[in-house]
Structures are given as structure tokens and as C-alpha cells.
């Protein structure tokens, strides 16, 4: 698969998703999607990622809330923490298509956090984070699975797509502290249930800053993203 294809698809995908987040920065009575001229594949992938961003971050919600200030303190920290979450979640999924959708979804979930904190400028590196992670971990199994050719067909089989237009999954950038605490308690409950089911510490969501920022593999990925951003025109 040509690298240019990956760049073109993901640049368009993330630009579209970030524009969608932008609509919710100011309260709206109604949200209408207009002026979209994407290919069917990007439209379907966009729908899947928009819904799945709520699924993929559930177990990581306590981690995101605990480290929100650090994550949105600089572009480097934003990239580092996003890579940490990706590395410690996506690679556990078996289906390459699930991995790709989860990767996009986690990146958008972190972008949503940056919008909530008024630091949406960091979300501009979303597509570059994906492209580096794709080349490192997703590309070979994704191509063996059928690549972009069969991805749309796979997405259309996912039952969670019915949630795409539901207001329940729209961003809420005006949460009260009480609302945030309720979300946190629910996420911690779900995480504990997952730990009990799998009989292991399901994900390293209790990792501290040193464990994240001093991880050599994560630092390597972050360096590649930063260098890629510097090379972009």
C-alpha cells in the first residue's frame, strides 16, 4: 500500500472529525452535517470512529482525567500520552480492522480532551500520530486482512454504528464537576469489572508520569511524530 494513500485518507479523516468536534465548542441547538464530499470509505470510517471514541476510552477515562493537565500542557506531552494509551491498548486487539478503528478512536478521544481544556491546537498532530503508529504496528496485519479494500464492508457490519446520530455521544464541553465525578466513578466501575473478568490488571491506567514519560518505546514513537511534524510543509 502506498504511503501516500494512508496519508491522504487519514489527513481527510482526522480533519473531518476535528471539524465535527469544533461544532460542539459553542453550544448548539441543532447540529447539521453539511458540505461533506468524502468517499464512502471515509464516511463509514468517520462514523465508526465517532461512535467508537466513546467505547475505546472507557477503561482509560480515569487515566485521562488524572493526567489531563499534563496531557494538555505541551505538544510533546500530548503526543507522548496518546502514544502510551495506543501502545497499551490497541496491540491487545486481535482483528487488524478493530486495531485501526481503535487507534483512530483513541486519538480522537484525546483530541476531545484537548478541546475541553481549550488546547485544541495540539489536536493538529492527530493524523501524524496515527501515521507513525500505523507504520510501526498496524500496516502489515492490516494489509494481510485486506487493507482499505474490505474495511468499509467490515464497518457496515458493526452494530454500534446505529449510535452515530445519537445526542448521547455528542461532546459536552460544559460539564460540571459533579458530572465529571459521576463519569469517573462509572469508568472506574467498568474498569474493575474488566479486571475481575480477565483476572489481570487489564490496562496500565494507574501508571504515573515517570512510567509514561521515561518509557523508551513511547519516547521513540514521540520523536518520530515530532520529526514528522517538522518535515511537513
Stretch-by-stretch model annotation:
Residues 1-82, 136-233:
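Terminal intrinsically disordered, low-complexity, charge-rich regions
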Residues 61-148:
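Core of folded catalytic or high-affinity ligand/protein-binding domains
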Amino acid at each position: 500500500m502506498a504511503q501516500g494513500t494512508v496519508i491522504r485518507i487519514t489527513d481527510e479523516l482526522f480533519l473531518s472529525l476535528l471539524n465535527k468536534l469544533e461544532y460542539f465548542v459553542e453550544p448548539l441547538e441543532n447540529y447539521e452535517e453539511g458540505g461533506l464530499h468524502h468517499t464512502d470509505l471515509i464516511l463509514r470510517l468517520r462514523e465508526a470512529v465517532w461512535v467508537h471514541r466513546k467505547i475505546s476510552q472507557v477503561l482509560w477515562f480515569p487515566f485521562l482525567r488524572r493526567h489531563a493537565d499534563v496531557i494538555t500542557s505541551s505538544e510533546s506531552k500530548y503526543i507522548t500520552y496518546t502514544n502510551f494509551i495506543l501502545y497499551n491498548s490497541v496491540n491487545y486487539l486481535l482483528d487488524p480492522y478493530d486495531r485501526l478503528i481503535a487507534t483512530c478512536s483513541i486519538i480522537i478521544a484525546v483530541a476531545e480532551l484537548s478541546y475541553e481544556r481549550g488546547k485544541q491546537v495540539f489536536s493538529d498532530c492527530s493524523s501524524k500520530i496515527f501515521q507513525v503508529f500505523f507504520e510501526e504496528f498496524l500496516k502489515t496485519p492490516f494489509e494481510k486482512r485486506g487493507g482499505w479494500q474490505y474495511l468499509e464492508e467490515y464497518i457496515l457490519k458493526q452494530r454500534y454504528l446505529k449510535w452515530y446520530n445519537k445526542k448521547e455521544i455528542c461532546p459536552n464541553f460544559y460539564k460540571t464537576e459533579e458530572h465529571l465525578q459521576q463519569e469517573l466513578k462509572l469508568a472506574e466501575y467498568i474498569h474493575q469489572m474488566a479486571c475481575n473478568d480477565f483476572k489481570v490488571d487489564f490496562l496500565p491506567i494507574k501508571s504515573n508520569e515517570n512510567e509514561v514519560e521515561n518509557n523508551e518505546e513511547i519516547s521513540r514513537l514521540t520523536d518520530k511524530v515530532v520529526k514528522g511534524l517538522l518535515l511537513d510543509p
